[in-house]
Amino acid sequence: MQAIHNDKSLLSPFSELNTDNRTQREESGSTFKEQKGGEFSKLLKQSISELNNTQEQSDKALADMATGQIKDLHQAAIAIGKAETSMKLMLEVRNKAISAYKELLRTQI
């Protein structure tokens, strides 16, 4: 009986596919780049900072509306809507992250 692991003819079609795929990725420039640790934390901090800025703009627009100092009601409504949408998005991202974390905790090793 012939040993399968010594038969290179079985592996040749797969090795050709692998090299073709590698050259296509290199030609198209879609290779994966290594990212430094902490990129996610920087992105998260930046997103939270932007959310905070939109919330502050919304609060200022609401305060201006309450005191009658608003000049453009349309811009105030846009700022409030933008802050509301940003907060909903951030809450959904948080919920998905918590869900993924809980799923990892349930994973058996």
UniProtKB/Swiss-Prot annotation:
InterPro entries: FliE
Statement: the UniProt record of this protein carries the keyword ATP-binding: no
Top-rank taxon: Bacteria
Organism field: Helicobacter acinonychis (strain Sheeba)
Record-linked PANTHER family: FLAGELLAR HOOK-BASAL BODY COMPLEX PROTEIN FLIE, PTHR34653
Bias-annotated ranges (Basic and acidic residues): 22-38
Coiled-coil blocks: none
Region (Disordered): 1-38
Name assigned to this protein: Flagellar hook-basal body complex protein FliE
Record carries keyword Nucleotide-binding: no
Main location as per UniProt: other
GO molecular function: cytoskeletal motor activity; structural molecule activity
Location of the protein in the cell: Bacterial flagellum basal body
GO cellular component: bacterial-type flagellum basal body
Family according to the record: Belongs to the FliE family.
Keyword line: Bacterial flagellum
GO biological process terms held by the UniProt record: bacterial-type flagellum-dependent cell motility
